[in-house]
């Protein structure tokens, strides 16, 4: 089975590090296979596949997508609370780096504001899922006779996912794709590594909802 890039990002920690190294935009390419993307870009698919195989960590264990309760619980536990916790810390780090290194030519000016804006949008988005969409999905699994209309709520969530993808591109642009200048401090290093992890998690989160969870109710 040919796996999509989004499947790889969702299943294997560290995949985005390899993709960034080869300048593969994993957010826009999530629905394409590695062969498709490398063919268009003229990259060596075999080399990239070997680098992916050499990643030190094994795959995450995803729950059975047919068990809606377990799948939703996984998303809540693995992503929703994690995003909230990490964004709060990253905003503080970004403010510190911008304040201390504002005169550096490669300082990520505007990153703290971009992270704060992402926090507000994600908080609103995840609250709608937690309070409205996910409970309705659980009810539909519990009661097969339920006729709760979910097409429009899911459509709205998909549109907001597109907005999150735009926010991810903004973070990548502000950080030069998370490329650290030489000799920067530990806070700057932690900021970029933490933001890169946030992006990796968010891409995987969106992929699991768009490609696995939502289609079961559309």
PLM region spans:
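Small-residue-biased structural context
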Residues: 1-218
């Amino acid at each position: 089975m040919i796996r999509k890039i989004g499947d790889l990002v969702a299943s294997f920690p560290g995949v985005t590090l390899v993709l960034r190294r080869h300048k593969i935009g994993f957010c826009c390419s999530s629905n394409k296979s590695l062969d498709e993307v490398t063919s268009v870009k003229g990259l060596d698919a075999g080399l990239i596949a070997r680098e992916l195989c050499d990643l030190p960590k094994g795959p995450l264990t995803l729950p059975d997508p047919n068990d809606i309760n377990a799948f939703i619980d996984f998303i809540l536990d693995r992503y929703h609370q994690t995003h909230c916790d990490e964004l709060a810390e990253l905003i503080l780090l970004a403010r510190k780096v911008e304040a201390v290194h504002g005169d550096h030519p490669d300082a990520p000016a505007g990153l703290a504001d971009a992270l704060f804006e992402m926090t507000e949008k994600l908080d609103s988005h995840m609250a709608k899922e937690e309070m409205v969409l996910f409970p309705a999905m659980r009810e539909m699994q519990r009661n097969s006779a339920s006729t709760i209309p979910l097409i429009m709520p899911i459509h709205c969530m998909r549109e907001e996912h597109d907005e999150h993808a735009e926010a991810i591109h903004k973070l990548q642009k502000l950080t030069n794709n998370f490329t650290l200048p030489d000799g920067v401090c530990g806070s700057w290093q932690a900021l970029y590594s933490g933001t890169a992890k946030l992006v990796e998690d968010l891409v995987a989160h969106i992929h699991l909802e768009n490609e696995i969870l939502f289609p079961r109710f559309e």
